[in-house]
Structures are given as C-alpha cells and as structure tokens.
C-alpha cells in the first residue's frame, strides 16, 4: 500500500513543478497606435487594431490576456478586453468627445496576462505602447459674421478692386467645417460683386448724382455647405469726386451796422484730398470801390466833415461848380457821385487854366503866393491807359507862382503806377527836386483821396488818410526852367517851345504873353474835390479823420496765431494775406478774418468778397490746385435815427408883440430829440401758450444835425409887411450858413442838437406896424448826415390878435375891407394877402363909418338884452319854484344860478366878422333885405375860426 501511494505523491510533485514554470513570457502589443473617434461618439477606431499576444498560449492563464491599462494624466478613455484568448481589446471614450475642446489625445497602453492561476499570481505586463487619438469634427456650427453691419465709402466714377471685406467665422474645429468656402450677395440687382474671401467690388462706375447710398445683404457658407445663421448688412456711400477746395463757408454774409467786427469764415476748412502741403498762401480781397468814392466813409458833406474833423479853413476850390464866377470848368464833362459831389472827367485832350486872382482866391502877388508851405488835396480815379506811351507822363496840376524872391514852380504827375511831385523852389538859382512814389492805388482805376503836404524840403503824401514817404528823391540837375510867368493849369502842363503845334483840347487855355506855349502831358482820368491851402498844412490826424476808410478787413487774434503763420493787411484794409505751412493752423487763422465797419450808419449794400489760394506740395507732379472762393458781405439797412421836433404848435399874440423890434419867437420851447428804434424779441414765458411777437424799443442818442429849414405854409412872405429874423452873429460864430428868402429860411452846417435848439428858439416872426395879417403857418424840418435822414415836419400856427380900439383907425378900417373881400377863405390862408395900395388909404367913406358905429351899438344892445333876460329868468325860478318837474325844495342849492361872478367873454374875431359884414354892406352896395340865414352866418365864427381859437395845441 505504501508503495502504491509513493508514486502518486511523486507525480503530484512533478505536476506542481511543471505548473510554476508555465508563465514564461510577457504579453506583446504594437509599439504605436493611431486612433480616430467621431465627435459626439465614444468608440475609438485604432490602426492597427488592438491585439495583445502571449507566447505562453495556449496555456490557461499564462497564455491569456486579462486586460489593458492606460497611462496618462486625465485620460478620457478606457480600454476593455474583448477576448482573453485572442487578446483583442477596444479603446472607448468615457464620455462623448468634443473636438472644439480638444482635437487630439495621446496616452500609453499596456497589456497584462492572467498570470499563473485564477488568482492572477505572477502576472506579466507588456511594454507600453503610445496611442494617438484624433477627434473627428462634425459640422455642428454655422458661420457667424464678425460684424452685423459693414460700412464703406467710395468716390464716384471709379472702379475698385476691393471696396471692403466682410468676414465670417465657423466654430467647428476641422478645416473642412471651420473654413468659409464662399460668400453670396442676397440682394438682387446691385452693382457689386463678392468673392470667396469676402472682398466686395463694384461692377460699374457709381455716380453721386444717382443713388448715393447702397444697402444690400450678404451671407456665408462653410465647406460643409452650412449657411450662416444671421446674414450681414452692407452699406456703401457714394461720395462726389474729391476736389481740393475750401469747405464750410457761406456765400452770403450779413452785417448789421454797429455790430463791430464780424468773422467772415467762422467754419471754413481746407480740403486737400490727403495731399501733403508744405506752404499755403491765401489772399482775401474786399471790393468796396462801388461805395461812394472807394469805400464807406462818413456820410457828411465835405464842408461838414471838415468842421467835425477840426480842419482849418482857407482852402481854395480849384475845380468849383461852373457858374458866373467860375467858368473855367464849364467845358469839362461833369458826373455826380453817390454823395452828390461833382466829378470831372478829363479825356486826355482837355485841361483847364485857373485864373489867378478874383473868384479863385489865388493871386499873383507875393502876398497870395503858395510859398513853400501848402497842402494839395484831391480825389482821383486813374487807370493805366493802353494807348499811351510807356514814357509819357500825365499831369494832374502844374503851377508857376511868384513870390518875394522870384518865381517857383511845381507839378504833380502820374506815370503808370508812379506819382511824382516836381518842386522848383527858385527858378533863377535853385535846382528842381523830384519826389517819387510807387503806389498801386495810382493805377487801379479806383477812387482814392490824395493829400500832399509840402514843407520844403519835406514832402508827405497821404493816400486815403495813410501817409507814404517818397520812395525816391531825385535831383534833376540842370534842366530848362519854365517861363517866369504865373500860371496854374489842371489836367496838363505847358512846355516852352517855338514852332510847335499846340495839342490843346476843347477847354485848354493859351498864354497870351510872350512866346506861344505848347500844352502837353494831358491827364486821362477823373478828378474831384481839388483844393489847395497855402501857408498852413493839414495835420495827419485831420487827414485821417477826413479821408480814411471806415470799413475793411480786420484781424485781431494774434495771440492764438499758430507757429509759422504770417498776416499782412494793406493800408486801405481791402486786402489781407495769410501764409503758413500747417493746414489746421491755417484753418484756425482764416476763421478769425473779419469785416469791420465803424460807422454807426453804414452805407447799406453789397461788398463782393474774393478768396484766392496758392499751395505748394511735396510732390510737384500731384500738387493740388485750390479753386477761388467768391462771396459777398451784405451790409444791412441801419436802424434809421428818428429826429423828433416838438413844442407849442399853436399860439396867439397881440399884434403889438409882433410889431416890436424883435418880433415874436416862433419856437420858444422847441425840443429836438434823436433816437434809434430797433427790434427786441420778447422773452418766452414757459406758461405762455400764445405766439411771441417782436417789439420795438427806442434808444436816445447824441447826434448832430447838418441843416434846418423854416418854410411857409401858404403864400410867401411879403417883405413890405413881414419878415423872419435870426441872429446872424451867433450863426457865424458857430460856422453855420444862413439863407433867408421870402419862401424859406435855412440854416446849414453841422452842429449838435443842443446848438440847433438854441438857435431855432431865437427865430422870430415880425410884422410891420399896421399890417392887417391875422394868421400864419410855419413849417420846420431838420436833417442830418447830408440830408440822409430827415425829421418830422413841425408846423406852428400863429394868430395875430388885433385890439377893438383900432377899428376907428383908418388903416384898420381899410384892412377890414381887404379882409372882407377874401372872407370866403379860412384865416390861415389869408395871411399872405398884401395891403391895398397907398392911394386907397388916403380916405375912408363916411357911410362905412356910420354903419360900423350902428353895428357896434347893435351888438352892445344885444348884450344888454341878454343880461336882462337872464336876470328875469333867475327871478322867475326863485319865485315860482321853477318849471314843471323841478324840485320844489327851496333849500336845494343846485337849482339856483349864482350870477354874482358872471363874466361875458367876447370873441374878438366875432366882432371883426360883424364889423366886416357891416363894411361889406356899405362899400359893396349890398341890399339891406339880406336873408336871416346870412345874418346868422355873419354873426357866428366859422368852424375854422373856432378851431384856431378853441382847439388845444397839436403835437406833430
């Protein structure tokens, strides 16, 4: 038995030894795997497939693969064994994959066998293989545009390769689905095209005159043909062709007088179309040549302006108005300017010789000579004459004068744009000196004022009130002196020569003494206001006050003037030049160029304006050109001053007051006021629901008058019976002129309102003793600024009261007869009738005297009867208790008429009317059986008489 068990035991031991030695090999897998997993799926497809091999196969456990292990941080996969015998395995995702989150995953994998038994003892592992898993994309996202709205601008008339680019993106991760394959314009009939990259171009030239804004819709597709969820909008604006020019300016600029300085281009800017510039020069020109004489000046007359500016008197007018005392200008062509001043036209063949002595005020003796101190003053409009030779001078004035030492000579000539003054202090010994100026004003064919002050050896020329020193002083050396003979010629000059034909015009004057003179160097242009003053010079301040322009271009913002900017204004302020190198700085400077007019009552009208620009570019080939800008300044009508004359408009005085030596003042309480009315917009109240209207307010101003006139309403004055009186001494002291005729009385000259009030209050009306005048009307009116503004017509009505005790006087009886003959006219119109001739005053009919006495007695009787009737009526009321219906209470004081202070006022005109009716009956042979209606008319004053006597004073 023991022997049988021993072999069995040995067999089991051998079997156990052989089992331990069975798991000899490790599993084997590929070194690298490539895997693909679809997005939103968890199965990984590997290449090559996942198989693990073990050389211990087919042994159980040792030859079987029990599983796979994955190594890596956060590996979202797991590996499962499908068949232990074959070693087949699978990798799967723990959850659906998201390509957009992570496209690829890399980790390692290792296989292990089942060991040597079911307990997995002595398990062997394979090497680690690398696994690359790529997540395949699914087209789940639609394209999305970067912007919902695309805008662009194009210039008209051009074809663009690319106007703008639209862009869409896709949220998918793969190139197939994340890329946009093409775009599409959805709006039909648009002149645009879009390519696969989103670039938009125009298919035809766009015009600004056509459609100025194009709107259309575009969409996008990815390579999976998925369309964008939201389409994009595109707006393309068509702009006009870019032209370098000034932008932001107004053609019409309104200027209100009194506004001070007004910016001409407050919003202007220069459009250069992106062309770089390194120099800009602009010139602003204000044209005022059509306003009076060249520009807006004070509106007073020349005489009034000289007084206001403090100019000395004593000037002599060399070109006066043609008349009996000044006939040397009769042959010249005369024009009139806007200020009513005379202008003389010299056509190049005419000249005038001013006679010395007499009305001209220029004598030929030493006491009347011009010496070496004088002022020449004149207006001139001169342009370059094409047909005249380049070397030919034109003479304005030529004069030879005699002084204590001999003869001196001077001439003023123009030559092109040069003006020259030749002065020869002494023809016998001194050498002539020529002073030259080169001024553009001389040849611009515009009006300018020239004043030449000679204080030898100093000569100063003022043009429009601005002084200019000579550009050249030339000593002419020895030249042939002119004839030693006093002569003054305007418009040409004489040259001494024999056997020369004269070139004289219609009004040229010959010199009869000595050899014949040749008139040459005729002037071609306009002259006006030509005067000379000897012995005293006009000061600079006076000349500037008289002739300086009151309007022009202005620039005052020098503090903010940018770096590199230059500003230049010509003396007459009609031309302003700006220069700079930076566009923005230049724009700022130009925005501060202003127009200014210092006159309170500026001349209304249009002032043309021109802006010219020259630029320099870095590239001369593509340099731009800036077109000219033209506009105009409109000076509005100023608020007219209202001159109001007021005072007592009606008064009556006894005839003895008018017959006094001083007469009766016509305007004893005259008041003159000057005010300006202007629009004031009413302020809006928040609670007010109606419309807001404009109101006018008046501001009283201090101003001057330049003339007043007292005229007659009705017939002219009869110098034999009546006159207007005014103190001429006070007028002369103030430099005022008086003109007194039978039709009017005028006071001329600029003075303050206070002075005119004082003078007019002294105006008196005087009657000669015995003049039978009963009423007069006088009209007073005043004006200012050379008659530009006039006052109201203030009418004063005057009644002359004649006393009744004058009736018996023969002259008054006769006056009553004359008054009766025109009794059908109202008293104001009777004032101009003259007295009867003296032979009719020599006797008075006795019958007329008798009738007058009877009429007066009848009038007294009627008055007495009236008093008796009133007294009897009073007694009846007191005794009988009054009429029916009246109160019977005797204590009521209102029922009794107290006649203790009864006064009867007799109208003197009524008594005159009664007497005149009686005289008419005697002298005219009227019948005694006249109608009772006629008697009633004769006994009562007419309506006009009532108005004269009873109406309160009017205010006009």
UniProtKB/Swiss-Prot annotation:
Keyword Transmembrane: yes
Quaternary structure (record): Interacts (via cadherin domains) with both alpha and beta isoforms of neurexins (NRXN1, NRXN2 and NRXN3). Directly interacts with APBA2. Forms a tripartite complex with APBA2 and APP. Interacts with low affinity with KLC1. Interacts with SLC23A2/SVCT2.
Biased composition (Acidic residues): 927-937
Main location: membrane
TM spans (from-to): 848-868
Biological function: Postsynaptic adhesion molecule that binds to presynaptic neurexins to mediate both excitatory and inhibitory synapse formation. Promotes synapse development by acting as a cell adhesion molecule at the postsynaptic membrane, which associates with both neurexin-alpha and neurexin-beta proteins at the presynaptic membrane. Regulates the balance between excitatory and inhibitory synapses by inhibiting formation of excitatory parallel-fiber synapses and promoting formation of inhibitory synapses in the same neuron.
Glycosylation site list: 299, 327, 347, 507, 740
Keyword annotations: Calcium, Cell adhesion, Cell membrane, Cell projection, Endoplasmic reticulum, Glycoprotein, Golgi apparatus, Membrane, Postsynaptic cell membrane, Repeat, Signal, Synapse, Transmembrane, Transmembrane helix
Cytoplasmic-facing ranges: 869-956
GO-annotated cellular components: cell surface; dendrite; endoplasmic reticulum membrane; Golgi membrane; postsynaptic membrane
GO biological processes: excitatory synapse assembly; homophilic cell adhesion via plasma membrane adhesion molecules; inhibitory synapse assembly; negative regulation of excitatory synapse assembly; positive regulation of inhibitory synapse assembly; positive regulation of synaptic transmission; regulation of excitatory synapse assembly
Topology term for the membrane: Single-pass type I membrane protein
Keyword Glycoprotein: yes
Ranges for region Disordered: 917-956
Protein name according to UniProt: Calsyntenin-3
Compositional bias per record (Basic and acidic residues), positions renumbered to this chain: 943-956
Posttranslational modification: Proteolytically processed under normal cellular conditions. A primary zeta-cleavage generates a large extracellular (soluble) N-terminal domain (sAlc) and a short C-terminal transmembrane fragment (CTF1). A secondary cleavage catalyzed by gamma-secretase within the transmembrane domain releases the beta-Alc-beta chain in the extracellular milieu and produces an intracellular fragment (AlcICD). This processing is strongly suppressed in the tripartite complex formed with APBA2 and APP, which seems to prevent the association with gamma-secretase.
Domain Cadherin, residue spans: 29-145, 146-246
PROSITE patterns reported in the protein's UniProt record: CADHERIN_2 (PS50268)
Species of the source: Pongo abelii
Name of the gene this protein is made from: CLSTN3
GO molecular function: calcium ion binding; cell-cell adhesion mediator activity; neurexin family protein binding
Family listed: Belongs to the calsyntenin family.
InterPro entries registered for this protein in UniProt: Cadherin-like_dom, Cadherin-like_sf, CLSTN_C, ConA-like_dom_sf
The organism's place on the tree of life at top rank: Eukaryota
Signal sequence coordinates: 1-19
């Amino acid at each position: 038995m023991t022997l049988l068990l021993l072999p069995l035991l040995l067999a089991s031991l051998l079997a156990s030894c052989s089992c331990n030695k069975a798991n000899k090999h490790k599993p084997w897998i590929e070194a690298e795997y490539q895997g693909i997993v679809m997005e939103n799926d968890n199965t990984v497809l590997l290449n090559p497939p996942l198989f693990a091999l073990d050389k211990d196969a087919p042994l159980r456990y040792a030859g079987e693969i029990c599983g796979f292990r994955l190594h890596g941080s956060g590996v979202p996969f797991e590996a499962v064994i499908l068949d232990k015998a074959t070693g087949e395995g699978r990798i799967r995702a723990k959850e659906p994959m998201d390509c957009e989150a992570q496209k690829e995953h890399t980790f390692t994998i290792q296989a292990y066998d089942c060991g040597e038994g079911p307990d997995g003892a002595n398990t062997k592992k394979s090497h680690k293989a690398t696994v690359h898993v790529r997540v395949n994309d699914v087209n789940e996202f639609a394209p999305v545009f970067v912007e919902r709205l695309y805008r662009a601008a194009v210039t008209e008339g051009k074809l663009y390769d690319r106007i703008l680019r639209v862009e869409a993106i896709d949220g998918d991760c793969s190139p197939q689905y994340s890329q946009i394959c093409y775009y599409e314009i959805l709006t039909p009939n648009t002149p645009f095209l879009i390519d696969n990259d989103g670039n938009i171009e125009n298919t035809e030239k766009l015009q600004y005159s056509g459609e100025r804004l194009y709107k259309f819709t575009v969409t996008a597709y990815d390579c999976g043909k998925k369309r964008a969820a939201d389409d994009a909008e595109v707006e393309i604006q068509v702009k006009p062709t870019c032209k370098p020019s000034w932008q932001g300016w107004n053609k019409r600029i309104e200027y209100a007088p009194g506004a001070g300085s007004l910016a001409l281009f407050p919003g202007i800017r220069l459009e250069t179309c992106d062309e770089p510039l390194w120099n800009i020069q602009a010139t602003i020109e204000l044209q005022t040549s059509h306003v009076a004489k060249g520009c807006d000046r004070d509106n007073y007359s020349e005489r009034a302006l000289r007084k206001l500016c403090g100019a000395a008197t004593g000037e002599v007018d060399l070109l006066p108005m043609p008349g009996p005392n000044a006939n040397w200008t009769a042959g010249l062509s005369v024009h009139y300017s806007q200020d009513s001043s005379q202008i003389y036209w010299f056509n190049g063949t005419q000249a005038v010789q001013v006679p010395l002595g007499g009305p001209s005020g220029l004598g030929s003796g030493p006491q009347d000579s011009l010496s070496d101190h004088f002022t020449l003053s004149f207006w001139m409009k001169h342009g370059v004459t094409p047909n005249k030779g380049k070397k030919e001078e034109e003479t304005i004035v030529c004069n030879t004068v005699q002084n204590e030492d001999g003869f001196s000579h001077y001439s003023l000539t123009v030559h092109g744009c040069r003006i020259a003054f030749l002065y020869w202090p002494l023809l016998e010994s001194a050498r002539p000196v020529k002073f030259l100026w080169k001024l553009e004003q001389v040849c611009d064919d515009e009006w300018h004022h020239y004043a030449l002050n000679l204080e030898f050896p100093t000569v100063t020329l003022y043009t429009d009130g601005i002084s200019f020193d000579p550009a050249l002083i030339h000593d002419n050396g020895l030249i042939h002196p002119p004839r030693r003979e006093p002569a003054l010629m305007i418009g040409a000059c004489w040259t001494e020569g024999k056997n020369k034909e004269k070139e004289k015009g219609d009004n040229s004057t010959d010199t009869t003494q000595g050899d014949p003179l040749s008139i040459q160097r005729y002037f071609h242009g306009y002259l006006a206001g030509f005067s000379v003053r000897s012995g005293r010079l006009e000061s600079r301040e006076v000349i500037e006050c008289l002739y300086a322009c009151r309007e022009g271009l202005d620039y005052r913002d020098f503090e903010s003037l940018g770096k590199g900017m230059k500003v230049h204004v010509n003396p007459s302020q009609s031309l302003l030049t700006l220069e700079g190198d930076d566009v923005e700085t230049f724009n700022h400077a130009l925005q501060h160029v202003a127009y200014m007019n210092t006159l309170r009552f500026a001349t209304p009208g249009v002032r043309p304006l021109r802006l010219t620009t020259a630029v320099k570019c870095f590239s001369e080939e593509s340099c731009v050109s800036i077109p000219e800008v033209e506009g105009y300044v409109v000076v509005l009508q100023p608020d007219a001053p209202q001159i109001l004359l007021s005072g007592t408009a009606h008064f009556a005085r006894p005839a003895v007051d008018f017959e006094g030596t001083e007469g009766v003042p016509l305007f004893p309480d005259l008041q003159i006021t000057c005010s300006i009315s202007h629009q004031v917009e009413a302020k809006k109240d928040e609670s007010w629901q109606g419309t807001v209207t404009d109101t006018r307010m008046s501001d009283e101003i201090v101003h001057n008058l330049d003339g007043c006139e007292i005229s007659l309403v009705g017939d002219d004055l009869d110098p034999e019976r009546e006159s207007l009186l005014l103190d001429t001494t006070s007028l002369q002291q103030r430099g005022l002129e008086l003109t007194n005729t039978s039709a009017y009385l005028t006071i001329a000259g600029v003075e303050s309102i206070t002075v005119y009030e004082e003078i007019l209050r002294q105006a008196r009306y005087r009657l000669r003793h015995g003049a039978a005048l009963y009423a007069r009307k006088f009209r007073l009116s005043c004006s200012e600024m050379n008659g530009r503004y006039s006052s109201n017509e203030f009418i004063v009505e005057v009644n002359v009261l004649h006393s009744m005790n004058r009736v018996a006087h023969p002259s008054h009886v006769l006056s009553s007869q004359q008054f009766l003959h025109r009794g059908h006219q109202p008293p104001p119109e009777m004032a101009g009738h003259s007295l009867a001739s003296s032979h009719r005053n020599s006797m008075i009919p006795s019958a007329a005297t008798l009738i007058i006495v009877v009429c007066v007695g009848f009038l007294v009787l009627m008055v007495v009867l009236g008093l008796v009737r009133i007294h009897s009526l009073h007694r009846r009321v007191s005794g009988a208790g009054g009429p029916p219906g009246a109160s019977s209470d005797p204590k009521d004081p209102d029922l009794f008429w107290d006649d203790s202070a009864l006064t009867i006022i007799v109208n003197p005109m009524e008594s005159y009317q009664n007497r005149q009716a009686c005289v008419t009956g005697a002298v005219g042979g009227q019948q005694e059986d006249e109608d009772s209606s006629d008697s009633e008319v004769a006994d009562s004053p007419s309506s006009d008489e009532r108005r004269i006597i009873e109406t309160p004073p009017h205010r006009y």
